[in-house]
Amino acid sequence: MLQLDEILANATTAIETAASLVALDEVRVQYLGKKGELTSQLQSLGKLPPEERRTAGQEINKAKGAVQQAIAARKDALQRAELETKLAAETIDVSLPGRRIENGGLHPVTRTVERIEQFFGELGFSTESGPEIEDAFHNFDALNIADDHPARTDHDTFFFNPDLMLRTHTSGVQIRTMEHGKPPFRFIAPGRVYRNDYDQTHTPMFHQVEGMLVDENVNFAQLKGILNEFLCNFFEEEVEVRFRPSFFPFTEPSAEVDVKRKDGKWLEVLGCGMVHPNVLRSVGIDPEKYSGFAFGMGVERLTMLRYGVNDLRSFFENDLRFLKQFK
């Protein structure tokens, strides 16, 4: 009992000097725990004479209450200090200059595809898609491409095996769409295509948009009118357009379409023609009843012309200095 004042003084000092909640809890255990010093004092009351026990018990409980209050007060102070430190660390200096958040922008190729889709969508053309890994029937056979055509060689096409390849055009989408429907058809097919070529004007992967219209009494004059209107709309000016006779296995007659540049030179921008009867037959459509036209354009080529880009490879190098120009 004679140690009670000393225990209380030591406990008070330990509580006041506890620098953290963990240290404070250690003090609590030391004095108030099951084996704590004040708890031991209570347990030793039985050794005192009966007449002294009550007074001693009251003194011990009084000391115990004082320690509990001191611990509670110190705990509250430590928690407030911890919160203040945390808030101070999270304080925002409103006088600091703000961080500029860069706005993203559409890739120029995406812009071109969306512009093409919008124009033809207004003419009633739907947008179709298909697999990028294509079989020989949809990529070559159904399109009237002969077995000895150069496109069937490894020099032009990425083959997985003789009957499976990365598609070289989106024409396969035209075949698949006609296979699963009945005329009339009016759609475009944008997408990635692959050819074994890489230089200033060619990349192994590029984008194409092909279009097709199949119905009764479709003629070449309608094709010319639509493409002429499209090119003027795309370049946002009246451009001079010419159609040159050409050859494509899947169209007959066929033509290449050129636009006249400001320097007076002609530049090819797309190919087109009337759908070959063999293509219609390959999907079970009677060429005596139905006719159609088809066209195809390289998206990167049109994008280069629209924005004055000289090297097609710039579109795929992810150089932000280049891409920021198109925001």
From Swiss-Prot:
GO terms (BP aspect): phenylalanyl-tRNA aminoacylation
UniProt keyword annotations, A-Z: Aminoacyl-tRNA synthetase, ATP-binding, Cytoplasm, Ligase, Magnesium, Metal-binding, Nucleotide-binding, Protein biosynthesis
Cofactor: Mg(2+)
Enzyme class: ligase
Cofactor note text: Binds 2 magnesium ions per tetramer.
Residues reported in the UniProt entry to bind Mg(2+): E252
Entry-linked Pfam families: Phe_tRNA-synt_N (PF02912), tRNA-synt_2d (PF01409)
Keyword Metal-binding in record: yes
EC numbers for this chain: 6.1.1.20
Protein localization: Cytoplasm
TM region positions: none
Gene Ontology cellular component annotations, sorted alphabetically: cytoplasm
UniProt-recorded Gene Ontology molecular function terms: ATP binding; magnesium ion binding; phenylalanine-tRNA ligase activity; tRNA binding
Keyword Ligase: yes
Cited InterPro entries: aa-tRNA-synth_II, aa-tRNA-synth_II/BPL/LPL, Phe-tRNA-synth_IIc_asu, Phe-tRNA_ligase_II_N, Phe_tRNA_ligase_alpha1_bac, Phenylalanyl-tRNA_Synthase, tRNA-bd_arm
Domain of life: Bacteria
Reaction(s) the record says it catalyses: tRNA(Phe) + L-phenylalanine + ATP = L-phenylalanyl-tRNA(Phe) + AMP + diphosphate + H(+)
Subunit structure: Tetramer of two alpha and two beta subunits.
Family membership noted in the UniProt record: Belongs to the class-II aminoacyl-tRNA synthetase family. Phe-tRNA synthetase alpha subunit type 1 subfamily.
NCBIfam families in the record: pheS
Name of protein: Phenylalanine--tRNA ligase alpha subunit
